[in-house]
Amino acid sequence: MSKAIVTGGAGFIGSNLVDRILPLYKEVIVIDNESSDANEQFYWNDKCTNHKLDICDYENIRPLFENVEVVFHLAAEARIQPTIKNPILSAKTNVVGTCTILQCAREANVKRVIYSSTSSGYGLKNKIPLNEEMPDDCLNPYSVTKVTGEKLCKMYTDLFGLETVAFRYFNVYGERQPIKGQYAPVIGIFIRQRDSGESMTIVGDGEQRRDFTHVSDVVTANVLASILENKEPVGKVLNIGTGTNHSILEIAKLIGDNYKFIESRLGEAQETLANTDRAKKMLGWVPSVKLEDWLEKNS
């Protein structure tokens, strides 16, 4: 293959993806501005062509798209609570930034853009398990802006012929997961708190349930979606989850026995659980990592 771009390629999911696709492309270009406060470090791969740039910076990122075959768009203002604190920044990065990436790809005749979205777009009103035909129920700036990105992808496919595939990830965890601050993903927070001798902080009563998906399975979905001969997922949204879920209290007990309960937070669903039939059918994708097995080995 020729070239690929990974936005957010020095972060958690992006850096794992970069490591996987390096053998598949003549050149992998990484765009990242190191803006995530939750990342303990950033993972720039020295085998890539690396650019510390903002995805909204059209003038500087546009030349990077020439002769690129596939764009993996992961850069975002991520996680719910930080976007509630700063909705303007989340709108700029997740909407304007995504539109900028799509426009650059369109102008450079990129063959396909693979977009990372979120299961939080399903909100509270939809019944479990969640499937892609259900209506959006966005409860916070994060879900609103990421789902808007999905709509932009669909529009660029329908109006301009740019092939796009959008993924709704369900609570990704694994190697290089963010651990800093109170708004990092919960598994990373719990491991950090336990290792530092603190009590693990469980929001609310801990009975909220989440479908946790290992980062390697997310990476596999991205690689499968980049196979250009497969047109079936183009213009579609696909769930990437496991089809099983665990309560936050269960997760805490798997990691340690020192925990406490803190006040509930606004804008978060009580339960997530993915129906992954579409990803299985269109990509041949199935999750391979069980949360309990990973925690036993890594926590």
List each model region and its residues.
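Residues that form or immediately flank small-molecule/cofactor binding pockets and catalytic motifs
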Residues: 55, 135, 174, 207, ...
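Residue-level signal for the nucleotide or nucleotide-sugar donor/cofactor binding architecture
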Residues: 56, 85, 93-96, 133, ...
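NAD(P)-dependent short-chain dehydrogenase/reductase
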Residues: 127-128, 151-210, 215-224, 245, ...
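Gly/Ser/Thr-rich beta-alpha loop segments that engage phosphate groups in nucleotides
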Residues: 10-13, 99, 125, 145, ...
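Residues in well-ordered alpha-helical elements
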Residues: 59-62, 69, 81, 88, ...
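C-terminal substrate-binding subdomain of Rossmann-fold SDR/epimerase-dehydratase oxidoreductases
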Residues: 195-299
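N-terminal Rossmann-like NAD(P)+-binding domain of SDR-like oxidoreductases, especially those catalyzing
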Residues: 1-170, 285
